[in-house]
Amino acid sequence: MGTASDAAALVTRLVRVRGRVQGIGYREACVRRARALGVTGWVRNRMDASVEAMLQGLPLQLEAMCAWLDEGMPAALVEGMEVIEVPAPFPRFDRFEQLPTL
């Protein structure tokens, strides 16, 4: 994402994934997928057994990332996903990382 038009097109979404998504390497796989797609932000487990992710990137990048989150990895069983668009202005992320459980 190097051009001014790319920066202007940035989208940020907060995603909550429910189902069997903890204790199976879902967050680690999420970090790998996000980095491969060029998505920045973070992912963390929640105490309610869900996984929460803040995603930032171009619309097509976030569509691909949300599709992956909804399907998950082979060991996951995604039962539901909530996506919230974060209105601008929003903080800029420079990488994708795994955060501690909240």
UniProtKB/Swiss-Prot annotation:
InterPro entries: Acylphosphatase (IPR020456), Acylphosphatase-like_dom (IPR001792), Acylphosphatase-like_dom_sf (IPR036046)
Keywords assigned: Hydrolase
Sequence ranges assigned to domain Acylphosphatase-like in this UniProt record: 12-100
Catalytic center residues: 27, 45
Reactions mediated catalytically: an acyl phosphate + H2O = a carboxylate + phosphate + H(+)
Domain of life of the organism encoding this protein: Bacteria
Stored Gene3D superfamilies: 3.30.70.100
GO molecular function, one term: acylphosphatase activity
EC id: 3.6.1.7
Family membership noted in the UniProt record: Belongs to the acylphosphatase family.
Protein's name according to its UniProt entry: Acylphosphatase 1
The species this protein was found in: Ralstonia nicotianae (strain ATCC BAA-1114 / GMI1000) (Ralstonia solanacearum)
Gene name tied to this protein: acyP1
